[in-house]
Amino acid sequence: MGSVTNLRYHLVLTTKYRRSVLQGIEQSVYDAFREVEKVSDFKIIEMDIEDGNHIHLVLKMSSRYSVSSMVNRIKGMTTHLVWKREPQHLSRFYWKGKRTLWIGAYFCSTMGDVSDDIVLRYIQNQNSPKKANL
């Protein structure tokens, strides 16, 4: 018999050197996350790019994988997809052949003690001009 889980996480990924590289390519970034979602074991509830240098995500994930392995998968695949879509834009910020996008660290918190509505309102009230079309 399988297990039933309801694991929700607030994940924040920050760009390398905290550069505002996501500014102007927001839709490409959102599309990359949606593409990774299709082939992975998580669901995006909400996502929002802030200041062009970090993205907030609310994810529902399976207990099959560890958080760190899922985050590494997300970071690796989105880096590849965004570079594939926006090489000229990203090469203005990152050079010497290094196809990087995210810093090694990340913030991740479970949402067990907080309702979806509270976290979603927090993310939506970050004054971002460009929101994801969910």
Residue spans for each PLM region:
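Basic nucleic-acid-binding interfaces
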Residues: 1-134
